[in-house]
């Protein structure tokens, strides 16, 4: 008996789903998705209207981005500048620097 009750409730729910799908396709009910018109009118050459949440999120993420860039540059600058040793100018010769010898005056 309990199996018949479960089967009847299953058939009832399935029938509701079938009817609601048919009504939605016929336009007699169901979910209304839009009013048929444009919700936001386009504005030619004007900035979009931003909400406070959008402004806060954009400032937060841009601040986070610049923090990450500056942090990485400060702590791992060789990733940007390269892994080259800085040359020691005291080891350069006058010839390499283009300085003429003293006895050629």
Curated annotation (Swiss-Prot):
Record GO cellular component, one term: respiratory chain complex I
Q: Which GO terms describe its biological process?
A: mitochondrial respiratory chain complex I assembly
Its subunit composition reads:
Complex I is composed of 45 different subunits.
- Report the subcellular localization: Mitochondrion inner membrane
One Pfam family of this chain: NADH_B2
Q: How does it sit in the membrane?
A: Peripheral membrane protein
Question: Any idea what this protein is called?
Answer: NADH dehydrogenase [ubiquinone] 1 beta subcomplex subunit 2, mitochondrial
Q: Region Disordered: which residues? A: 85-105
Lineage summary: Eukaryota, Metazoa, Chordata, Craniata, Vertebrata
Q: Where is the transit peptide?
A: 1-33
**Organism field:** Pongo pygmaeus (Bornean orangutan)
Ranges of Acidic residues composition bias in the record: 95-105
Q: Which UniProt keywords apply?
A: Electron transport, Membrane, Mitochondrion, Mitochondrion inner membrane, Respiratory chain, Transit peptide, Transport
Keyword Transport assigned: yes
Q: What does this protein do?
A: Accessory subunit of the mitochondrial membrane respiratory chain NADH dehydrogenase (Complex I), that is believed not to be involved in catalysis. Complex I functions in the transfer of electrons from NADH to the respiratory chain. The immediate electron acceptor for the enzyme is believed to be ubiquinone.
Q: Which domain of life is it from?
A: Eukaryota
**Which family is annotated?**
Belongs to the complex I NDUFB2 subunit family.
């Amino acid at each position: 008996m309990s199996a018949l009750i479960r089967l009847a409730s299953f058939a009832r729910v399935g029938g509701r789903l079938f009817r609601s799908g048919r009504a939605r396709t016929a336009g007699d009910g169901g979910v209304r998705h839009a009013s048929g018109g444009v919700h936001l009118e386009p504005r030619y050459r004007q900035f979009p209207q931003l909400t406070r949440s959008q402004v806060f999120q954009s400032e937060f993420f841009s601040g986070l981005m610049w923090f990450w860039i500056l942090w990485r540059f400060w702590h791992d600058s060789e990733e940007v500048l390269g892994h080259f040793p800085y040359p020691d100018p005291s080891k350069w010769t006058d010839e390499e620097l283009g300085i003429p010898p003293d006895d050629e005056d």
